[in-house]
């Protein structure tokens, strides 16, 4: 798979347990990961979270720019 790919490909990689990021994001060391709930989790469905440039983990929602971008990469 090339270094830069579509958001749809990023979703496939997230489902495989990989971390993905956009080359165009301003903050470095930012990435996304798919969290799958376990028995101890308060969440009941999988969700995507982001590691921010400050090192925090937060829930993430894609913008239209993110969805249409072709600069996604595996971290």
Residue positions per predicted region:
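Extended non-catalytic interaction/regulatory regions in multidomain proteins
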Residues: 1-52
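Short, compact, well-ordered microdomains
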Residues: 50-75
């Amino acid at each position: 798979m090339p270094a830069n790919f579509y958001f749809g490909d990023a979703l496939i990689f997230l489902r495989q347990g990989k971390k993905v990021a956009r080359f165009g994001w301003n903050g470095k060391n930012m990435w996304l990961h798919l969290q799958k709930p376990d028995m101890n989790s308060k969440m009941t469905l999988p969700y995507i979270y982001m590691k921010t440039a400050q090192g925090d983990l937060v829930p993430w929602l894609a913008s239209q720019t993110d969805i249409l971008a072709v600069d996604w990469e595996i971290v």
